[in-house]
Amino acid sequence: MKSASTVVATRILGLDPGLRITGFGVIDKLGNQLRYVASGCIRTRDGELPGRLKTLLDGVREVVAAYTPDQVAVEKVFVNVNPQSTLLLGQARGAVICGAVSCDLPVHEYTALQVKQAVVGYGKAAKEQVQHMVQRLLALDGCPSPDAADALACAICHAHGGQGTAGAFAGRRRAGRILVAPDPG
């Protein structure tokens, strides 16, 4: 009879904030291995900004309740040519971060360059390259949607020890989850 060894897995929720569509991706990190758990999008309807921000906040809380992550990785805002778009994206990002922090999760931030470098090996990679590498790294049958792929890429970046900023947005740390795996010996 083989004995079982205990492996501690860390569940990471990656978020790619957007006012219309916020991508989410959930992975488990077991040692050096990554395992896909889930991904999808939180969509807001056209309408008043406060209602859309509430949809994002509630959506993140629902994802956290469904998948119980230990940590959260969020892509930082890039400065757009259009200042109004940048402000709206910043507000959406704030709602997403508040959703995670209100669930007592530590939030780590990464630039798009850091995420692409960690996943593709090139900081200026195209979205299609990110999608393809996410599919390969997580052994997915098909390519995830661009928003979900970006969120999964953010989670992968964090899992690979990306140098995100956890300072001001850190909630209380959660312990990893315990999984039992058969002893290979």
From Swiss-Prot:
Pfam families, alphabetized: RuvC
Source superkingdom: Bacteria
Cofactor binding note of this UniProt entry: Binds 2 Mg(2+) ion per subunit.
Gene that produces this protein: ruvC
Keywords: Cytoplasm, DNA damage, DNA recombination, DNA repair, DNA-binding, Endonuclease, Hydrolase, Magnesium, Metal-binding, Nuclease
Protein role: The RuvA-RuvB-RuvC complex processes Holliday junction (HJ) DNA during genetic recombination and DNA repair. Endonuclease that resolves HJ intermediates. Cleaves cruciform DNA by making single-stranded nicks across the HJ at symmetrical positions within the homologous arms, yielding a 5'-phosphate and a 3'-hydroxyl group; requires a central core of homology in the junction. The consensus cleavage sequence is 5'-(A/T)TT(C/G)-3'. Cleavage occurs on the 3'-side of the TT dinucleotide at the point of strand exchange.
Residues noted as binding Mg(2+) 2 in the record, renumbered to the chain: E75
Matching CDD domains: RuvC
Catalytic activity: Endonucleolytic cleavage at a junction such as a reciprocal single-stranded crossover between two homologous DNA duplexes (Holliday junction)
One term of GO molecular function: DNA binding
Location within or outside the cell: Cytoplasm
Protein name (database record): Crossover junction endodeoxyribonuclease RuvC
Organism: Aromatoleum aromaticum (strain DSM 19018 / LMG 30748 / EbN1)
Residues noted as binding Mg(2+) 1 in the record, renumbered to the chain: D16, D147
Leading EC class: hydrolase
UniProt GO BP: DNA recombination; DNA repair
Assembly description: Homodimer which binds Holliday junction (HJ) DNA. The HJ becomes 2-fold symmetrical on binding to RuvC with unstacked arms; it has a different conformation from HJ DNA in complex with RuvA. In the full resolvosome a probable DNA-RuvA(4)-RuvB(12)-RuvC(2) complex forms which resolves the HJ.
Cofactor(s) listed: Mg(2+)
